């Protein structure tokens, strides 16, 4: 509890009217969809055989939305490249955080489940195991070679079918 005056004092100041965390302008790469419009759309006319998707660390706090968002992105990219069966290889989040950080580790485990759900429920998608390569103190595992081999084997196996 507390008085409305006290709560108002504790609230962080509002950003100025018109403030945006993104660079202004239609070509700003850091605005929402900026990377898509400035990079991906430009390579769409070229041949692509598959996509290795290694992302998700920054979405752990919104993990309940992740499966739907990634599924929509996969459908959109397949449409953009005009390849309805474009393979997607989803790299599982590596294990991360100290064994003592039970809440954080639980959140990462739930995120891995969301990634697996996407691979299980979307055609021509695969999950590339990575949870065994993580380190408690580094969000980006040092063992890139093993992960690279797994990704290559998965892609080659799909490509050779």
Language-model-derived ranges and their functions:
Residues 1-161:
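Cell-envelope and extracellular/periplasmic
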């Amino acid at each position: 509890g507390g008085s409305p005056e006290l709560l108002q004092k504790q609230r962080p100041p509002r950003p100025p009217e018109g403030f945006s965390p993104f660079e202004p302008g239609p070509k700003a790469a850091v605005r929402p969809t900026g990377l898509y419009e400035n990079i991906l759309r430009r390579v769409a006319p070229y041949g692509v055989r598959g996509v290795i998707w290694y992302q998700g660390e920054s979405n752990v706090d919104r993990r309940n939305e992740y499966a739907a968002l990634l599924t929509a992105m996969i459908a959109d990219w397949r449409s953009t490249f005009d390849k309805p069966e474009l393979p997607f290889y989803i790299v599982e989040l590596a294990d991360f955080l100290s064994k003592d950080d039970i809440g954080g580790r639980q959140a990462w485990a739930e995120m891995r489940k969301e990634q697996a759900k996407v691979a299980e429920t979307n055609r021509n998608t695969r999950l590339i195991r990575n949870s065994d390569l993580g380190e408690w103190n580094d969000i980006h595992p040092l063992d890139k070679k093993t992960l690279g081999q797994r990704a290559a084997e998965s892609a080659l196996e799909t490509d050779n079918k």
